Every structure is written in C-alpha cells, then in structure tokens.
Amino acid sequence: GDDFLIEKVRNYYADKYSIPVVPIDRKDKDARAIIITSYLDLVAQIVERNWQEHIQRLVQDSEYRENFFQLLPDTAFWQREWQTHSASSSQMELTEWAKQQFQPGSIDVNIMTKLDKKNTSNGEELPVEYNDAHAILRGFALSKLNSSVVLSAGMNPLLFSYMQKFADFFPGNDGNFRKKIIVKVSDYRSALVQGKMLAKKGLWVSEFRIESGLNCGGHAFPTQGHLMGPILEEFKQKRT
C-alpha cells in the first residue's frame, strides 16, 4: 500500500542524508501510523538541516547569496536590506537576521477523509482508529511538525471526532496551534456545514481552501457547475 511506499521513501532519504533510522515492523497493527510519524519527522529533520546550511551559505558566500536574491520577487529590496544590515552587524547578528527573514515553509499533510478503509489483523477487524485515514491522522498528530492538515474529499464525522483526542489541534497557553486544520471545500454550503461540525467538537478551522467543482470531485456536496467567481462572491457576502 501507500504506507509501504512511504517507508521505502523514508529509507531512501535517510540513507542519502546519512541519518540513522529504526526499522518498522510492518506486522505491527499500528505500522501505518508509525510509518507516517517517522517519515514526517525525517522530512522535518532534513528541512531543518538544509535550512541551516542555506542560512550559513547566505552569510558566507556572496555568489550564492546573489543567486538566491535573484530568485526572490523583489531582488533590489533584499539587496538593499542586506547591504544595510551587513554594514552594521557582526556575522552572528547577520545570521540571526537572515534566520528571521527566511523561514522554511510549513510541511503540510493532505488527508482524503473518505479513503478510510477498515483493516484487519490475523483475520479480525481492528478498531476504527486503525482505519486508513484515522491512522494517517494519528501519524501526523504524533509527529514533531508544527504545520497543517488539509482535509479533502468530503466529510468523515468519525474522523472529525477522532481529532479531538490530540492536544496539538487545540490552542496552547500562548493561543497558538501546533497543528492547524485546513478544509478543502467546493462552495460556501460545504464550508458552513463542515465548519459547524468541527466547531461543535471544539476544533478550529484555520483556513477554508476553495476549489472549483469543475476541476475536482469528491467533495462533501456536488456543485451546480458554478465557476470560481460566483463561489467566492457567496463567501464574501455571507462571511461574518
């Protein structure tokens, strides 16, 4: 299955970056969730390593820095900013400034909520938390990521309820979320229904990601073939 592929990818990149990993027993009834968690943590580790190397090269390698600035939308602005800070800052201060300006992106995870097949072990059906989508959600929730889960392809009330079990989906003492919820929707009605369903469980939707029903299927409600313009207008008129 896809979890087997993910494990192969994890081993490939662990070997490429010389990162030791612990083999996962695929006979473990929770292997799917463990594989997801281990893979996501590895991705986070690699991103962190590459980001640190990127910052170091920005500070120390002028050719690398100039090539990077050329990739940014406002090249001249960043060239001026760099000249201003480099003229009055130590290398350590410049490194800290660069870290603040050039943060790595969020490692988000997409879950197709309806792909939630039941699983068995030794011929016996496992509890619902071992269903495919439930296991993926658990794998994400238990990872070290500070990012978002994107719920797509319709509603799964059981999965929504299961999200309540993980503290990272709720705000911490500082009011921030370690794990945010993004819901893909095709129209306002879908956003309203799913948003209310999650709100009743105490779960906050950080973003509704709108996709036209003309170029994607499998959403909670079939659309009438409306284009994106009228869909966005309805959100604009009815948002509170």
Map each language-model feature to its residues:
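Active-site-adjacent beta->alpha loops and helix N-cap segments on the catalytic face
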Residues: 133, 156-171, 187-191, 222-224
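Generic, low-specificity signal for short hydrophobic/alpha-helical stretches with a mild N-terminal bias
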Residues: 21, 25, 122, 173-176, ...
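Acidic (Asp/Glu)-rich catalytic clusters
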Residues: 139-144, 163-174, 198-202
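Residue-level signal for well-ordered alpha-helical segments
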Residues: 28, 117, 126-128, 171, ...
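Glycine-rich phosphate/ribose-binding loops and adjacent secondary-structure elements
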Residues: 179-240
